[in-house]
Amino acid sequence: MTAQGFLLIATFLLVLMVLARPLGSGLARLINDIPLPGTAGVERVLFRLPGVSDSEMNWKQYLCAILGLNMLGLAVLFFMLLGQHYLPLNPQQLPGLSWDLALNTAVSFVTNTNWQSYSGETTLSYFSQMAGLTVQNFLSAASGIAVIFALIRAFTRQSMSTLGNAWVDLLRITLWVLVPVALLIALFFIQQGALQNFLPYQAVNTVEGAQQLLPMGPVASQEAIKMLGTNGGGFFNANSSHPFENPTALTNFVQMLAIFLIPTALCFAFGEVAGDRRQGRMLLWAMSVIFVICVGVVMWAEVQGNPHLLALGADSSINMEGKESRFGVLVSSLFAVVTTAASCGAVIAMHDSFTALGGMVPMWLMQIGEVVFGGVGSGLYGMMLFVLLAVFIAGLMIGRTPEYLGKKIDVREMKLTALAILVTPTLVLMGAALAMMTDAGRSAMLNPGPHGFSEVLYAVSSAANNNGSAFAGLSANSPFWNCLLAFCMFVGRFGVIIPVMAIAGSLVSKKSQPASSGTLPTHGPLFVGLLIGTVLLVGALTFIPALALGPVAEYLS
């Protein structure tokens, strides 16, 4: 990796930390149930109108509110996509989606995955994009943040049974965090040249004298929350490599910052609410170390070029296949790691065209559970599961009952932690096996051999871990793949949220014990190393056999 690559990573992380720190303080106020200045009156009016109670909920009530909102959104979006030809803002007269594609798309956006088995500009109307997908981009992001709010309160409250009010949290997260920041980002994108209109597609004459139909639409408004909410679904098929979505190098840098902004701010907020900012910094250090190493590996692999092209005598000093020439290899490598470390899935380069090792790293980042910064909310509660596991392992080594932030971690919490951690690996490995065992699964593979298996493994990993990016060589728009991936997305999202909320319900009722000489410090470099080791160990033991059949075999062949 060149000095330019190091400078790019350092600049990105520096700007990220500067922006995330004040946002973290604002999020800490919301976690502590302190309204932001000037918002209390608005909140009272908004709750009185529908008659919603703002009293606190136990973990089951909180969970039911989150699940109820998401199930309602799933049903509304599903029927909206089926009948989009009856709805307004459809200047191209696009038909409704098939039932399997509508189901896949609805589940995808409700679960914050944004897997797309379709091309946006030829499949969805402006109304479906705006009133359907963009709305779910906000709600799915707010749902993930609300869950981590509840879990943080569980660690910091003592001898209580309630975790806050889900409706209050969802309202505050949406109105005072997601909407204002997304609005600022959208205005910046428009200023830089991103589209924002409701015009019919425009026929233009090219410099060669041919005619081309240019897609239009309300792009910038969807693009902003797509990145900020770590959603990732593109308005166009080319996603963020399309100049109408991502027109300049500056918008590209802002998009990467937006992906990591809230996950980073939540780490700062956790430290503030816990009363020990070192706890939040510990999580950031662990995430950042894994992130920097992964970026370095991808940059190194892509700068080496494609060995198969070199063997044919072609000039392939760097691997530019599938990459936008506006951004180049280093920026494309950084973006690939950012979008897969977080559960975003937006792309500016085709991951299917990366080298074997360059494509394996994004796949592995998804497989370990999207815990390196991760999705908004989901990344931090996923990492907290590994924190509990690391504390448990340390307790076994020193012969003490494991505890974290003064709360003892008992058998119930560890069973739920193990269940939550095992959900996505089970979906990935069994889903990939099912796809390879069936003709319907194998027929979607564009390439034979190890790379074809990598396409399958990447798709199931992306769906189960709610990322949404793809090795695009897989032809996934079929009833088999739409249903398989919809199942993986649904269980991968809510199959983790349910045990996380149960853990929160168990922890909030416990009393914190004062630290003693035998208490394991969870804020220093020793615990950072233990946490990183736990993440790597679980990832290695679970996925090395599958990776050996895919990208590793491709690299060695």
From Swiss-Prot:
Q: Which InterPro entries match?
A: KdpA (IPR004623)
One Gene Ontology term of the molecular function aspect: P-type potassium transmembrane transporter activity
Record flagged with keyword Cell inner membrane: yes
Output the superkingdom of the source species: Bacteria
In the bilayer, the protein is annotated as: Multi-pass membrane protein
Q: Where in the cell is it found?
A: Cell inner membrane
Residues spanning the membrane: 5-25, 63-83, 132-152, 170-190, 253-273, 283-303, 329-349, 356-376, 379-399, 416-436, 484-504, 526-546
Its predominant location is membrane
Q: GO cellular component terms?
A: plasma membrane
In terms of HAMAP family, this protein maps to: KdpA
Q: How does it assemble?
A: The system is composed of three essential subunits: KdpA, KdpB and KdpC.
- What is the similarity comment for this entry? Belongs to the KdpA family.
Q: Which PANTHER family match?
A: POTASSIUM-TRANSPORTING ATPASE A CHAIN, POTASSIUM-TRANSPORTING ATPASE POTASSIUM-BINDING SUBUNIT
Q: What is this protein called?
A: Potassium-transporting ATPase potassium-binding subunit
